[in-house]
Amino acid sequence: MAKSLSITPVSGLSRLPWRAYLEMTKPKVVTLMLLTVLVGMCLALPGAVPLQPLIAGMLGIAMMAGAAAAMNHLIDRRIDGLMARTYNRPLPKGKVPVSHAATFAALLALLGFACLYWLVNPLTAWLTLASLLGYAVVYTAYLKRATPQNIVIGGLAGAMPPLLGWTAVTNDFHGHGLLLVIIIFAWTPPHFWALAIHRKADYAKVDIPMLPVTHGVAFTKTCIFLYTILLALACLLPVLVGMSGALYLLGSTLLSIGFIYKAWQLKYHETPGMAMDVFRFSIYHLMLLFILLLVDHYI
């Protein structure tokens, strides 16, 4: 008599903590970053972006950005476990072993670099690697713990994506691509300082010298306000060099006025939760600004 066979589903994949690995890549941050990469690609060319550098460039940059984020999780795992905003991350919670996280980050970086080097161009591969090291090593491992100007200095690494998109389709280091870097570079401090105000106690507890901890909240609010003005000026650069036109000028001006107004409210008429309102507005500001650059380019 034939033995009845019981089919047991293969549950290996279901046990794999893929969500934890995905979380370590900071997918929301990478998605916004990829928008700026795409805009850099599109603005670099008068017509359509060729398919190979578009797909391979986006994929390679995304993998290396995810690797940088995973390295950030690795380096910050001790302080993450002590902070209310980050204590539930995969490494502090033990969802992913440290050795597995390190292997994951290294493989992701290697695959991303290979994709860019062989399928896009070496210039983009090396620039992306420099950005990864700038964020994961220079900023996360050193600057973050060394100076209240950590965000200002380290912000350059996070501002590089549109230039990476530009070089991916042109294999050329162009000044117009650098203008997009300047915009994100000026945007980064008010974005992160608003969050730092909201999470001041957390940063103080783990001895991270964020500006509100070292110089006080009032001084930080002033810096945020001044940087929004600087950002508004930086946002005019694409128009001044003829890279963008009237639609972008109108839209970016309205966004700049909105950001400056939010920063003014934070400084002079703060209400509970205002710092996080500024933080959230800054995300929409950057997203809409780059969408405007894209739309203006094609009309």
Swiss-Prot record:
PROSITE patterns in the record: UBIA (PS00943)
Membrane topology: Multi-pass membrane protein
Subcellular location: Cell inner membrane
Catalytic activity: heme b + (2E,6E)-farnesyl diphosphate + H2O = Fe(II)-heme o + diphosphate
Top-tier EC class: transferase
Annotated metabolic or biological route of this protein: Porphyrin-containing compound metabolism; heme O biosynthesis; heme O from protoheme: step 1/1
Misc note: Carbon 2 of the heme B porphyrin ring is defined according to the Fischer nomenclature.
PANTHER family: 4-HYDROXYBENZOATE SOLANESYLTRANSFERASE (PTHR43448:SF7), PROTOHEME IX FARNESYLTRANSFERASE, MITOCHONDRIAL (PTHR43448)
Protein name: Protoheme IX farnesyltransferase
Organism: Shewanella amazonensis (strain ATCC BAA-1098 / SB2B)
